[in-house]
């Protein structure tokens, strides 16, 4: 990206690369968190906000996520629980997962990865995360991780339900559109042989779940 800049990304010269992509393996439950939108993050953090999506690559039996606030729970309910140091997990929807499930979390939606899950994460290029609950865990010195109660209450939107999709097990077409949201689109490409990707106005990021060869006019590259 530093070398080729806008010729590679299709973005205006000097523009920050807008996405982060990660592989996350969770042995145990991660902290419950929420991210601000661009407007709040700009004012309070001088940074971008964050929306993100998860593609479940592997899930142990019984694995689950925390994904959005339960129906009927209000921001006042959350405020009482958070300021009172109560366990907020009963206020959050727990969703079972399996390999191939896709979850989108817009800014303001509470979420947490459960244990026994390997996932692929696509997100806006931002490190702004507000931790609202960490299950009262302590480190070796008996210290709890810091929480961001007021910031979380500022940005949580209990009405958000996110978007869900599933990677096709037996795709009837080469390209399956999974998500199309303001920050990114997410497609699943499955081909028995060669697949020609249509032209795009900006960059693509290809992540190979199985070995493949990427070919273009000037050469080719093995993805493993």
Where are the language model's segments positioned?
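Glycine-rich, small/acidic residue-mixed loop/short-helix segments
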Residues: 221
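Active-site region of the double-stranded beta-helix
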Residues: 1-99, 113-209, 217-218
């Amino acid at each position: 990206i530093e070398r080729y800049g806008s010729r590679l990304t299709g973005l205006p010269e000097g523009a920050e690369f807008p996405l982060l992509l990660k592989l996350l393996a969770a042995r145990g439950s991660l902290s419950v968190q929420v991210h601000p939108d661009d407007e709040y993050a700009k004012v309070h953090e001088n940074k971008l906000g964050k929306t993100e999506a998860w593609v479940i690559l592997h899930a142990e039996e019984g694995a689950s996520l925390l994904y959005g606030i339960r129906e009927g729970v209000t921001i006042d309910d959350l405020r009482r629980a958070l300021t009172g140091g109560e366990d907020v997990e009963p206020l959050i929807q727990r969703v079972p997962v399996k390999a191939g499930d896709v979850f989108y979390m817009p800014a303001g939606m509470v979420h947490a990865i459960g244990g026994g899950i390997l996932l692929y994460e696509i997100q806006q290029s931002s490190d702004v995360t507000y931790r609202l609950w960490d299950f009262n865990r302590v480190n070796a010195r008996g210290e709890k991780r810091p929480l961001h109660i007021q910031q979380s209450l500022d940005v949580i939107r209990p009405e958000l339900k996110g978007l869900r999709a599933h990677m096709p097990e037996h795709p009837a077409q080469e390209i399956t559109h999974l998500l199309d949201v303001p920050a990114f689109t997410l497609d699943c490409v499955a081909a028995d042989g060669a697949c020609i990707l249509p032209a795009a106005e900006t960059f693509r990021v290809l992540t190979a779940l199985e070995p493949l060869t990427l070919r273009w006019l000037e050469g080719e590259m093995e993805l493993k």
